Amino acid sequence: MQSADNLIWIDLEMTGLDVDSCKIIEIAAIITDKDLNIIAEAEPIAIYQPDEVLANMNEWCIKTHTETGLTQRVKDSKISTEAAEQQILEFIRKFVPYQSSPLCGNSIWQDRRFLAKYMPNIDEYCHYRMLDVTTLKLLNQYWGDGKSFEKKNTHKALDDIRESIAELKFYRQKLLSI
């Protein structure tokens, strides 16, 4: 059911951080209500990229995406960037009206840059505002007790979103008391 109070959480895995030379290789999405209760999850989608794109990954990406199995999933995938965008957009539309939800996540500006370039329909569907959990992490480092949320950092898109939601709940209780 659509609600303007629902939140769109997206995480991308990419071949690197340079939006001009790197590509999206995985996308996942979760919809929560405003109290951060999960309403629905979209299965993570591995996006096909040719070998020459994967060959240009840096050492960190090669190691991490190989260890998680994502590199092989990308090679085996038949799903294009455009098809993945359409699937995620259809999922979001079921729960969130056009431009009513900020894009939510950790360091979400980086994901937003890739969405703007490679999945512009998702980028446009989200409100221009962003809810970046990393901001609260930094505020806690600067003004709080410095005790951070413990993350597993699996670098799997759906896991990363779940962790971002849990992290926001942690900081909501710790810093905001609301």
Curated annotation (Swiss-Prot):
Location, primary (coarse class): cytoplasm
Location of the active site: 128
Keywords tagged on the record: Cytoplasm, Exonuclease, Hydrolase, Nuclease
Residue ranges constituting the Exonuclease domain according to the UniProt record: 7-168
Gene3D superfamilies in alphabetical order: Ribonuclease H-like superfamily/Ribonuclease H
Enzyme class label: hydrolase
GO molecular function: 3'-5'-RNA exonuclease activity; nucleic acid binding
E.C. designation(s): 3.1.15.-
This protein's GO CC annotations: cytoplasm
Compartments it resides in: Cytoplasm
Gene Ontology biological-process annotations: DNA metabolic process
Record-linked InterPro entries: Exonuclease_RNaseT/DNA_pol3, Oligoribonuclease, RNaseH-like_sf, RNaseH_sf
Coiled-coil segments: none
Hydrolase recorded as keyword: yes
Highest taxon, organism lineage: Bacteria
NCBIfam families for the chain: PRK05359.1
Family from the record: Belongs to the oligoribonuclease family.
PANTHER family: OLIGORIBONUCLEASE, MITOCHONDRIAL (PTHR11046:SF0)
Function according to Swiss-Prot or TrEMBL: 3'-to-5' exoribonuclease specific for small oligoribonucleotides.
Protein name: Oligoribonuclease
